[in-house]
A protein has these predicted regions:
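Conserved alpha-helical substructure of the radical SAM core
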Residues: 1-5
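Conserved AdoMet/S-adenosylmethionine-binding subsite of the radical SAM
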Residues: 14-162
Length: 162
């Protein structure tokens, strides 16, 4: 029927067993399930059942500019799974040198095609977004990545605390 269920917020794969039960309920009650798309930080391996139901994934790996320790935010086996399973990759960029990490820890080691990569400005307000977006958009053009604005900042001028 064309319905898409986008599952995001914090790390949704923490709840993947419960979400699979929810899908079973939907299928039993309605006779169909929507297309599922996750936004994940790529630290938890998706259950193989998600592949069976055709779920798609957008990964947003936390980079060192996030401040979390590397052992909590960088899981090579999970990143490898996402690169093999055609997930999209979204990176929050503060400055051009952040691309050293994007290429060195993600693009090159996992052979991620540039067409599956989105860059977003690292910012906490509408004003900061307006200031940084042109630089990030130019980097996206230069390296043949996609660019995505942070719509919640542009529309509501508020950062999401997830």
């Amino acid at each position: 029927n064309g319905a898409i269920l986008k599952i995001t917020g914090g790390e949704p794969l923490v709840q993947q067993k419960a979400l699979l039960k929810f899908l079973e309920y939907m299928e039993a009650e309605w006779g169909w399930i929507p297309r599922i798309d996750f936004e994940t930080n790529a630290t938890i391996m998706p259950d193989k059942e998600w592949v069976r139901v055709g779920a798609t994934f957008t990964t947003s790996p936390k980079m060192s500019n996030n401040g979390d320790p590397e052992d909590r935010r960088y899981k090579p086996e999970v990143l490898d799974w996402h690169s093999i399973n055609a997930s999209g990759f979204k990176f929050v960029i503060d400055k051009e040198s952040d691309l050293d990490e994007v290429f060195g820890k993600y693009i090159s080691p996992f052979d991620i095609p540039t067409g599956r990569v989105w860059l977003m400005p690292c910012c906490g307000s509408r004003e900061e977004h307006i200031e940084k977006a042109p630089m990030v958009a130019e980097l996206a053009k230069k390296y043949r990545f996609n660019f995505s604005p942070r719509l919640h900042l542009l529309v509501w001028n508020m950062a999401l605390k997830v």
